[in-house]
């Protein structure tokens, strides 16, 4: 797969020494020349971004960033001054947070698989060693383009054709204890858009309700849920979203209504396609839970067969322990 870089520029955000944290911007005065090395770097950044956990956002009506982006897309401004303004706004927002640090600011407009994107990231540098042509060991620094968590991407194609979309903007979810998502929302002048977790949970509820209205017994219901899970797992493995129409076609029609029509009639608010969330979808075929030093996970089809739930006494009875668990118990009795 190839990537077509249209415009790209690098700037530096440098943290100044002293008691009060400040970020100083070092701005390029021209765009980077587009070379095979530049395109290879952007391809790696694109691929790394694809594999990261992301949240969705939309621009607020008063977003300064969105206003400047619109002028760029309308041809009223150039990419370089736009990038200068972005770097300064990013530094202004980032310095408000305790994790503020410098890095290389990358702003790139590119096309991948007929979709145009604007990619924005702050990349850390890492120290390493190299051996030169005289076999001398020297210290060097390199851009850590696979490990980064301050980045966002705007789907310009979708933004141009559907400004009311709730998913044209994505950004990397921050690590626990870091409000990366918060500062990026402030920098972009954005608010939460599509919530994949909520959409996945709503999908699971819709599937359960569909089976219930179809008057399926527990075994039939579990068979349908397994079908749904297999389709969703295939979408995850191929990097695709859950298409409700495709999912519906893979499911049985119950009471003369297919799943897609049922979901629409019941007004669940499902999108036509949903980014899959693996952990949420696992509950289609598994029961799991942990607490008070106990962790339990088992296939849903085992309930009422090898796993017996006594709701009144709040107990689970397991018939036929896993061999490795039984061995551990015997060794430590």
Curated annotation (Swiss-Prot):
The keyword Cytoplasm applies. The keyword Amino-acid biosynthesis does not apply. Its main location: cytoplasm. Transmembrane segments: none annotated. It comes from the Bacteria. Disulfide bonds: none annotated. Keywords: Cytoplasm. GO terms for molecular function: double-stranded DNA binding; single-stranded RNA binding. This is Nucleoid-associated protein HAPS_0704. The lineage of its organism: Bacteria, Pseudomonadati, Pseudomonadota, Gammaproteobacteria, Pasteurellales.
């Amino acid at each position: 797969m190839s990537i077509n870089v249209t415009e790209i520029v690098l700037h530096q955000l440098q943290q100044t020494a002293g008691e009060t944290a400040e970020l100083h911007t070092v701005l390029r005065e021209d765009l980077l020349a587009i070379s095979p090395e530049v395109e290879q770097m952007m391809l790696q950044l694109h691929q790394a971004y694809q594999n990261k956990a992301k949240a969705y956002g939309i621009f607020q009506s008063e977003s300064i960033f969105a206003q400047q982006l619109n002028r760029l897309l309308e041809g009223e401004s150039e990419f370089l001054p736009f990038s200068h303004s972005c770097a300064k706004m990013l530094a202004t927002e980032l310095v408000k947070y305790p994790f503020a640090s410098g890095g290389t600011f990358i702003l790139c407009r590119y096309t991948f698989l007929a979709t145009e994107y604007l990619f924005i990231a702050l990349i850390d540098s890492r120290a390493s060693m190299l051996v030169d042509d005289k076999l001398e060991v020297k210290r060097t620094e390199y851009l850590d383009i696979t490990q980064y968590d301050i980045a966002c991407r705007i789907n310009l194609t979708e933004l141009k054709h559907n400004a009311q979309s709730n998913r044209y903007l994505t950004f990397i979810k921050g690590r626990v204890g870091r409000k990366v998502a918060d500062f990026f929302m402030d920098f972009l002048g954005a608010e939460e858009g599509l919530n994949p977790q909520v959409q996945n949970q709503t999908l699971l509820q819709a599937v359960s309700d569909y089976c219930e209205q179809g008057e399926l017994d527990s075994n039939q219901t579990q068979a349908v849920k397994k079908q749904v899970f297999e389709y969703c797992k295939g979408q995850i493995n191929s990097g695709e979203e859950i298409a409700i129409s495709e999912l519906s076609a893979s499911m049985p029609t119950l009471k003369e209504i297919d799943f897609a029509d049922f979901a629409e009639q019941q007004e669940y608010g499902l999108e036509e396609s949903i980014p899959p969330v693996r952990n949420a979808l696992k509950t289609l075929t598994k029961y799991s839970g942990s607490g008070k030093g106990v962790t339990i996970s088992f296939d849903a089809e085992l309930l009422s067969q090898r796993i017996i739930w006594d709701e009144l006494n709040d107990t689970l009875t397991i018939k036929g322990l896993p061999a490795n668990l039984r061995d551990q118990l015997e060794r430590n009795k």
